[in-house]
Regions:
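Positively charged, polar, low-complexity stretches
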Residues: 1-83
C-alpha cells in the first residue's frame, strides 16, 4: 500500500516542521506518510525523538543528493490525559 506524500521542498523552512507535525498528528496508529525534502531531515528526526518518543517509525526510502524521501509512521498513540 502506498502512503501519501508530503512534499515540503517548495515551502519556506519555518513552515515545514509545523506542517509535518500537523500531518503526523492527524494520522491514526499504523498510518504513515512519505516526507519529500531537499535535504537530509535528520534535525526533524531528533525533534520527533524529543516530542514523540516511541510513537513513530522513521525509514529512509531515498537519501539524496537532491531528494530525500522518508516514510514516517505513527506506531502508537499519546497517553490519555488525566481528567
Amino acid at each position: 500500500m502506498s502512503q501519501p506524500e508530503l512534499d515540503v521542498r517548495n515551502l519556506i523552512p519555518r513552515e515545514r516542521h509545523p506542517l509535518i507535525f500537523r500531518t503526523f498528528d492527524a494520522l491514526a496508529a499504523g498510518e504513515a506518510f512519505v516526507l519529500v525534502n531537499d535535504h537530509d531531515p535528520k534535525p526533524l528526526y531528533y525533534q520527533f525523538q524529543a516530542e514523540s518518543t516511541g510513537r513513530f517509525s522513521w525509514e529512509y526510502l531515498e537519501q539524496g543528493p537532491e531528494v530525500w524521501r522518508v516514510k514516517i509512521e505513527k506506531v502508537g498513540s499519546a497517553p490519555a490525559k488525566a481528567q
